Regions:
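...captures the hydrophobic TM-helix bundle architecture rather than a specific catalytic motif
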Residues: 2-187
């Protein structure tokens, strides 16, 4: 999983740190210093990092907090708190996914399509793969919520929730890197 995201970050940084000109322009503008393009490529309108991406960042950070709350509540034997915290975490995961879907809708209709070059390709693949991980994590936490309801988790036996929490925090950290690199620095 980590290496998959490393590949996307690598592609993003390779393309953004040494932007290439389209082949048509390359032949016309080549000189002894070499041709260098701009980043993001001309014609690509990027998202305002303080709009939907920032809201999604806040949502994931809050969900990381509620996930940790759920884990500690189970460890302390506070079942009702764990249920409440897991409901909040799952709800925040669903909110993130819906906002990401809305962002994709906006991107396709107002910003860029997948086929518009390297920036959209890496953007859609990296954020889409992350979004897939959020959906998997939301389902994972939903199963944990069901198991807490059924009293399957105790202070001594809660590995499923602990694994889900580790997974969820991985998803949080990846998003922070995506937010900083793609939305802030990449724009």
């Amino acid at each position: 999983e980590v290496m998959f995201f490393v590949a996307f970050f690598w592609a993003f940084f390779d393309a953004s740190l040494t932007p290439k000109l389209p082949i048509e322009e390359f032949a016309e503008t080549f000189d002894s210093n070499g041709a260098v393009g701009v980043w993001p490529p001309e014609g690509i309108k990027t998202f305002d990092p303080l709009d939907i991406p920032f809201l999604n960042t806040l949502i994931l950070l809050m969900s990381g907090t509620t996930c940790t709350w759920a884990h500690h509540a189970v460890r302390e034997g506070h079942r009702d708190q764990a249920i409440q915290a897991l409901w909040l975490t799952v709800g925040l995961g669903v909110c993130f996914t819906l906002l990401q879907a809305f962002e994709y809708y906006e991107a396709v209709h107002h910003y860029f399509k997948f086929t518009d070059g390297i920036y959209p390709s890496v953007f859609y693949m990296a954020t889409g793969f992350h979004g897939f991980h959020v959906m998997v994590g939301t389902i994972f936490l939903g199963v944990c919520l069901f198991r807490v309801y059924k009293n399957h988790m105790t202070p001594d036996r809660h590995f499923g929730l602990e694994a889900a929490a580790w997974y969820w925090h991985f998803v949080d950290v990846v998003w922070l890197f995506l937010y900083v690199c793609v939305y802030i620095w990449g724009a």
